[in-house]
Curated annotation (Swiss-Prot):
Keyword ATP-binding among UniProt keywords: yes
Subunit structure: Tetramer of two alpha and two beta subunits.
Keyword entries, A-Z: Aminoacyl-tRNA synthetase, ATP-binding, Cytoplasm, Ligase, Nucleotide-binding, Protein biosynthesis
Protein's UniProt name: Glycine--tRNA ligase beta subunit
GO cellular component annotations of the record: cytosol
GO MF: arginine-tRNA ligase activity; ATP binding; glycine-tRNA ligase activity
Catalytic activity reported: tRNA(Gly) + glycine + ATP = glycyl-tRNA(Gly) + AMP + diphosphate
EC number: 6.1.1.14
Keyword Nucleotide-binding: yes
Gene Ontology biological process terms in this record: arginyl-tRNA aminoacylation; glycyl-tRNA aminoacylation
Enzyme class, UniProt record, top EC level: ligase
Organism: Shewanella baltica (strain OS155 / ATCC BAA-1091)
Length: 689
């Protein structure tokens, strides 16, 4: 079979930079799915993307589908011929539909009888006759929330489309994509190189675009080039560029021919907290800030332009003029905000509604303050600092800086708290109260910070559930799922001795009569338990392990985590599968017992050697297990219990549990109940698969 390389390019207006990668990846996934469905073999496929183009390159694509034989089954032989052996009308109609006579049909014998069959040879379709429709279907399935129309065209896409190119080797594939006829014309850079040129071969795409059109179409190459050049530029001025991958991705999606330049700003702006300056540079201008070896912000920034200029100094000057007013704003806001303490802003929180039924932000910080102090008392943190940090926790939202640069909330609160003379614990808690802000973010570690972060999240969870606005489906306007994961992570990762029931009860009490949902506390607990399952699954923990622990309903997250780790370790032991099966068997036996389960073991009624051995082993282990359970050393406890395997196996091999003698039966049930209870101190091992 012959092969060729395929190139598909769609030339567009500037595509949304934050969607560029997703569009390209989806286009590739959709097209390769089409090729696979059509049984078209290929070696590999990659995507390219730049601000004004999406492209796919498929290597060693088969030039045609393979010929194949399709079995077309007809009527059963018993109904295909009449009593005289002549073909029935049904048989003749089937044969005619397949272009053969009944006599030319083959026979197929199955366990259900004999059938007429025609093995039709179907010739494969040439690839060039399939690609246009496949590419169109791939484009139709792109994740475009708001498609647009342009001109008089009824076609819709994320941006207007100007060119479409489909080449199979050197051959132009005829057809249309989004109403644009396929042609060899490829557009170059807007301001450099050839505005457009003819592409002779699919293999020339990257090199011709780069050399003739001044476009680097390979997204990853552009990204790597920007990163390398930015790092070199920063090193030249004795610093290190702050290159977050998300910003790097966005910048790479904005330029076709990246040129990295270095600019500066007045040193006087460094008196402003660096986070505000960085927010301005990165968020508004898409610049890379530069820091020295000590982590101090330098009065420089690195930016990427989309053109090779004969006068780069002019471009640098232009960017410096653009950023200067934003930095001046930050300086003005900071100096203005410093004239008022955070405490003096407390009354203004009364003017901001948190939620209609839950009151103002002032009401919320009062609740956070009380709950944070309650948590601090249980964890050994400074309760006075926790109460103070909770009270001030939202005051920075009323500052000019945070109103203008919203992502600096918490961070500016920390700086203002330090300027106000608050304790360092209070200042740090102002920033860390929002942690973890996103998946993979760190959690607060300082005691006061943990107390305030937990109080804030729990107040929101209990309050929103309390007014009957729990998340439904994908909708989660109050980000309760993130808050719940945050609560669990803070407690688990800091090994805090906190009980969810106690925390929820306290939070509910602080809401007073605001809550209309009488089941709020139970619903919040269930919601948190469900987040446990999702969180551990994301960490690769087996569902059966999670369910085994959930069955015991431990409400202390740190304790829950210890059980998860212990059961995960237990499952790696050789004895685990046999003991899990035995526990399942014990559970089934005990479930059939009517009334209360027997609990007292009478040694004189242990008549069989196997039950005597099991009882002796349990008696030997129990004094060793008790302190392990008390200290939550579940892993060591399960390791000891794994030593029961042989005794348990022998018991079920030799002993009839449901004996006719009632006393013997109850004694054996008590023995099994005791055995099961030892495991249930940790988890329901019977649920392990």
């Amino acid at each position: 079979m012959n092969f060729e390389n395929l190139l598909i390019e769609l030339g567009t207006e500037e595509l949304p930079p934050k969607s560029l990668r997703k569009l390209a990846e989806s286009f590739l996934a959709n097209l390769t799915e089409e090729l696979t469905k059509a049984d078209l073999a290929f070696s590999s496929a990659v995507w390219y993307a730049a601000p004004r183009r999406l492209a796919i390159n498929v290597t060693e694509l088969a030039l045609a589908q393979a010929d194949k034989v399709v079995e077309k089954r007809g009527p059963a032989v018993s109904s295909a011929f009449d009593a005289e052996g002549k073909p029935t009308k049904a048989a003749e109609g089937w044969a005619r539909g397949n272009g053969i006579t009944v006599e030319q049909a083959e026979r197929l014998v199955t366990d259900k009888g004999e059938w007429l069959v025609h093995n039709a040879k179907v010739e494969g379709v040439e690839t060039k006759n399939l690609i246009a429709a496949m590419a169109q279907r791939a484009l139709d399935k792109l994740p475009i929330p708001k498609p647009m129309r342009w001109g008089n065209n009824k076609t819709q896409f994320i941006r207007p489309v100007h060119t479409a190119t489909m080449l199979l080797g050197s051959e132009l594939i005829e057809g249309e994509l989004l109403g644009i006829k396929s042609a060899r014309t490829v557009r170059g850079h807007r301001f450099m190189g050839l505005k457009q040129f003819e592409l002779a071969h699919a293999d020339h795409y990257l090199t011709d675009l780069k050399e003739k059109g001044k476009v680097i179409a390979d997204y990853e190459s552009r990204k790597a080039l920007i990163k390398a050049d930015a790092e070199k530029a920063a090193a030249k001025i004795g610093g290190t560029a702050d290159i977050e991958d998300s910003l790097l991705e966005e910048v790479a999606s904005l330029v076709e021919w990246p040129v990295v330049l270095t600019a500066s700003f007045e040193e006087k702006f460094l008196s402003v907290p660096s986070e505000a300056l960085v927010y301005t540079m990165k968020g508004d201008q898409k610049y890379f800030p530069v820091f020295d070896d000590a982590g101090k912000l330098l009065p420089n920034f690195i930016f990427v332009t989309n053109i090779e200029s004969k006068d780069p100094a002019q471009i640098i000057s232009g960017n410096e003029k653009v950023v200067r007013p934003r930095l001046a704003d930050a300086e003005f806001f900071f100096n203005t905000d410093k004239k008022h303490t955070l405490e003096s802003r407390l009354p203004s929180l009364e003017t901001v509604l948190f939620q209609q039924q839950l009151g103002t932000l002032k009401d919320k910080v009062n609740r956070i303050s009380a709950l944070a102090a309650f948590i601090a008392e249980q964890t050994g943190a400074n309760a006075v600092d926790a109460a103070r940090a909770g009270l001030l926790s939202k005051t920075d939202l009323m500052t000019n800086m945070v109103m203008e640069f919203t992502d600096t909330q918490g961070t500016m609160g920390m700086h203002y708290a330090r300027l106000d003379g608050e304790t360092e614990a209070v200042a740090v808690a102002m920033e860390e109260q929002y942690k973890p802000r996103f998946s993979g973010d760190t959690v607060p570690s300082a005691g006061v910070s943990c107390a305030v972060a937990l109080a804030d999240k729990l107040d929101t969870l209990v309050g929103i559930f309390g007014i009957g606005q729990a998340p439904k489906g994908a909708a989660d306007p109050f980000a309760l799922r993130r808050a719940a994961i945050g609560v669990l992570r803070i407690i688990v990762e800091n090994k805090l001795p906190l009980d969810l029931v106690d925390l929820i009860t306290k939070a509910q009490a602080l809401h007073g009569t605001n809550l209309s949902n009488a089941n709020a506390s139970d619903e919040v607990l269930e919601f948190l338990m469900a987040r446990f399952r999702a969180w551990y699954q994301d960490k690769g923990i087996g569902v059966d392990v999670i369910l085994a622990v959930l069955a015991r309903r431990p409400t202390r997250p740190a304790d829950f985590d210890s059980r998860i780790n212990a059961v995960s370790h237990f499952r790696s032991l050789e004895a685990s599968s046999a003991l899990a099966a035995a526990n399942k068997r014990v559970s089934n036996i005990l479930a059939k017992v009517e009334g209360a389960l027997p609990t007292t073991i009478n040694a004189s009624l242990l008549t069989e050697a196997a039950e005597q051995a099991l009882a002796a082993k349990l008696n030997e282990l129990q004094p060793l297990l008790a302190p392990l359970f008390a200290n939550a050393d579940y892993q060591q406890a399960l390791t000891l219990l794994a030593g029961l395997r042989e005794s348990v196996d022998q018991f079920f091999e030799d002993v009839m549990v449901m004996a006719d003698d009632e006393a013997l039966k109850n004694n054996r049930l008590a023995l099994l109940n005791n055995l099961r209870e030892q495991f249930l101190h940790v988890a329901d091992i019977s649920l392990l698969q």
